[in-house]
From Swiss-Prot:
Pathway: Carbohydrate degradation
Species of the source: Kluyveromyces lactis (strain ATCC 8585 / CBS 2359 / DSM 70799 / NBRC 1267 / NRRL Y-1140 / WM37) (Yeast)
Chain's role: Hydrolyzes intracellular trehalose to glucose. The disaccharide trehalose serves as a storage molecule for energy and carbohydrates that is mobilized during nutrient stress.
Protein name: Cytosolic neutral trehalase
EC number(s) from the headed UniProt entry: 3.2.1.28
UniProt cross-references to InterPro entries, sorted A to Z: 6-hairpin_glycosidase_sf, 6hp_glycosidase-like_sf, Glyco_hydro_37, Glyco_hydro_37_CS, Trehalase_Ca-bd
Gene it is expressed from: NTH1
Length: 754
């Protein structure tokens, strides 16, 4: 990282101020920073030169007894970086508090890209070979005098800010140097909390229903129009949606009821006319008309290209949203999950019609508890009511989905990812299964598209292909699509991840029944009403997991194949989900820390599995995104929390530093990038992932405005384990090896390095 930054408090001295300086915080959100109050073109002086008003330098503090600060609100202290100085030798330049006057945004943007974006991808990164310097005007001189902005980080931030200014239709802007050389830890945290979550938030309302309902994944004639399906007994929601469709017929929005009984056959019948599934809505009074109207609760989506509510992504995003005080969005997602279970029978993979048979890893009990606590817990009747409804729904899903056929294996008493479904998953990209279908097409002497139609219409029967797609749907339900761990076997595996989550459900339900509902949850079947009932279920599950999944010698929980009745040997990071659930004994936790953790810890954090388990790669056996060498935010978050639960916060601190370094380094070197997953074995370009589906969050022009949902959360949550010393190190991109190596002996212990 290079450039120049203020790393010292300003000296006391007299200064002039301006109305702009007093109003606009250098770290405010783009809608404020590039709003009308800061537009130079609207603040022209009436002097004889008709020149833009001259503003004084904005300093974070000045004068004896004067207190003023633009410190980011997300940190109690600001720890800026030291960077190389430029030619400007003024006092303000030496303090890193210059302000730049960009007289022509479009012209400057073009010049910047022409000079610095040498690979033409509309980003400025360490891979570009430009001069890494640009001249810009100063505010004090109305742009007459120029200074230099240097280095990849500041230039990429300049590109981001100019791109945002253009989005707000700004022709001229005044930019604070503090915004361009902001400590990257502060900047990323600020963007996640103040901008990314906003960009990822959706809700079903009259303004965007057609956009959200439109499906980009399905390319059939009947999929051209936006469509939404509504549960048969949701008349208010149905009428509201019909009203919106009639308000603007040009949208061609179709609103249809679903039947009471939803079968796999019915779900398949919707594949050529897919639609969005209605979510929870609440009644509001229209302030203009005074009439009652229904509006959807807000929810967050994983990435910018998504409009659906996703299953387990939502839990991890909720953790970050709560950390950012976005309680309304986190609560909205709990409301949606309650609605989905009540009306669709389960928390869905996502709220599209072709996901009606498929769930995802269950996290509702912990999610509801986190939201309830943020709402005030038992001191808030609204929070307790939400908790009651959420746990009632979670228990329903537990009994009818996760511990029922076909997901429950009766012999072991453990559960598998075994969803219903018929035919080929329609949401996959064209050609995704061609290598599998080719031999069947040749068998029937037809083309692959023709065979696909024959198979989906059940005019031909291929039992082996049925089993293949059963496992494929299971992989998608597991959330780990795809991995060699699950290939051609997923539906037959009692996995440590799913059964850890169900154990967590059991202990959470026991806790809530006892604490909030007088140890008697009315309306439940016999054997499931009291805390003692659920504690017994948890004890039995732990015994079965220890019997079938735990391996004392290696210190791993492995998956168990219920068909072959054999334990697998695939070393997955999900072994640590048992710690997150609180299911392991202290002795088991120690074995995992001593034996499993060293195998899964890499340069940038925890890897999804070991290289040995993944096996050799080839043209016929390509990389899978949920395997080595990739690391994922949900794994980091659960393992951090699980280790802390068992007294290993030192290891959590070390692992979190590794992951946060990787994220920060990519953010600094690659134009503010925040992506879905990282290669945790690479220190230079960890965002570059060569696997199926690419890497969500990497494809942007000029500025990243969303990041990726659960990765955003991981940064906020990981920072909670960092002290000021670690934050400073991350802000200057000190590698884990150097950082750990320079720690004093007492500090090394805090990172599990003694």
């Amino acid at each position: 990282m290079d450039g120049k930054v203020n790393n010292n408090p300003p000296r006391s001295r007299h200064r002039r101020t301006s109305s702009l300086e007093e109003v606009v915080d250098p770290f405010s959100t783009p809608d404020v920073y590039y709003g009308p109050k800061s537009d130079p073109s609207k603040l022209l002086s009436k002097n004889r030169f008709t020149r833009t008003r001259t503003f004084s330098v904005a300093e974070p503090g000045g004068g004896k007894g004067h207190s003023s600060s633009y410190t980011s609100p997300y940190f109690d202290t600001t720890v800026p970086l030291r960077r190389r100085g430029s030619e400007d030798d003024s006092y303000s330049a030496s303090q890193g508090q210059r302000r730049f006057y960009i007289e022509d945004v479009d012209k400057t943007l073009k010049e910047l890209l022409a000079s610095e974006d040498t690979d033409g991808n509309y980003q400025i990164t360490i891979e570009d070979t430009g001069p890494k310097v640009i001249r810009v005007g100063t505010v004090n001189s109305n742009g007459y005098k120029h200074v230099h902005i240097r280095g990849t980080y500041m230039l990429s931030n300049l590109l981001q800010e100019l791109t945002l200014a253009k989005l707000f239709n700004r022709k001229q802007v005044i930019l604070d140097e503090a915004r361009l050389n902001e400590n990257p830890v502060n900047r990323m945290t600020r963007l996640i909390s103040g901008q990314f979550w906003k960009s990822l938030t959706r809700r079903i309302d009259s303004n965007n229903i057609a956009k959200i309902a439109y499906d980009t994944k399905i390319d059939t004639p009947k999929a051209k129009n936006p469509r939404i399906y509504v549960p048969y007994n949701c008349q208010d929601e149905y009428q509201q949606l019909v009203q919106w469709s009639e308000m603007d017929p040009s949208l061609q929005l179709e609103v249809n009821y679903l039947p009471k009984d939803i079968t796999p056959e019915f779900v398949k019948s919707l594949n050529d006319k897919p639609g969005l599934l209605c979510l929870a809505m609440e009644s509001h009074m229209d302030p203009v008309t005074g009439e009652e109207t229904w509006v959807g609760f807000p929810y967050a989506v994983p990435g910018g290209r998504f409009n659906e509510l996703y299953g387990w992504d939502s839990y991890f995003m909720a953790l970050g949203l709560l950390e950012s005080n976005k309680l309304d969005v986190a609560r909205g997602m709990v409301e949606h999950f309650i609605f989905e279970i009540d009306h669709y029978g389960k928390i869905l993979n996502a709220n599209r019609s072709y996901y009606l048979c498929r769930s995802q890893p269950p996290f509702l009990t912990d999610m509801a508890l986190q939201v309830c606590r943020k709402m005030g817990g038992d001191k808030n009747p609204v929070a307790v009511d939400l908790l009651r409804r959420a746990f009632k729904a979670a228990i329903k899903e537990y009994l009818t989905v996760w511990t029922a056929s076909p997901r429950l294996d009766e012999k072991t008493g453990l559960s598998c990812y075994h969803p219903d479904g018929i035919g080929i998953p329609p949401e996959t990209e064209p050609g995704h299964f061609d290598s599998i279908l080719r031999k069947y097409a040749e068998k029937y002497n037809v083309s692959i598209p023709e065979f696909r139609d024959l198979y989906n219409s059940q005019k031909v029967h291929e039992p082996d292909l049925d089993v293949f797609f059963l496992h494929d749907r299971g992989v998608r339900e597991s959330g780990h699509d795809t991995t060699y761990r699950f290939e051609n076997v997923c539906a037959y595996l009692a996995t440590i991840d799913l059964n850890s989550l169900l154990y967590k459900y059991e202990v959470d339900i026991a806790y809530v029944i006892k604490k909030y509902f007088g140890d008697n949850f009315e309306g439940l079947p016999e054997g499931h009403r009291t805390s003692n009932d659920w504690e017994k279920l948890a004890e039995v599950r732990k015994e079965r997991i220890d019997k079938y999944l735990w391996d004392e010698e290696t210190g791993f929980y492995y998956d168990y194949n219920v068909k072959t009745e054999k334990r697998t040997s695939y070393e997955s990071v999900t072994t640590f989900w048992a710690l997150w659930a609180g299911m392991s004994s202290q002795e088991q936790a120690q074995r995992m820390v001593e034996n499993a953790l060293p195998k899964l810890e890499e340069f940038g954090g925890l890897v999804a599995c070991t290289a040995r388990s993944r096996g050799e790669l080839s043209l016929d056996r390509p990389t899978r995104q949920w395997d080595y060498p990739f690391g994922w935010a949900p794994h980091q978050i659960l393992v951090w929390d699980g280790l802390v639960r068992y007294g290993y916060e030192n290891h959590t601190r070390r692992l979190a530093y590794r992951w946060l370094f990787l994220m920060t380094k990519a953010f600094v070197d690659y134009n503010g990038i925040v992506v879905e997953k990282y290669d945790v074995t690479r220190g230079t370009d960890p965002h570059r992932v060569d696997a199926e589906y690419g890497n969500q969050g990497a494809d942007f022009k000029g500025v990243a405005t969303e990041g990726f949902g659960w990765v955003n959360s991981s940064y906020l949550l990981g920072m909670k384990y960092m002290n000021n010393f670690a934050r400073r190190a991350l802000g200057t991109c000190v590698t884990p090896k150097v950082f750990f190596g320079r720690l004093p002996p007492k500090e090394k212990k805090k990172y599990g390095l003694e």
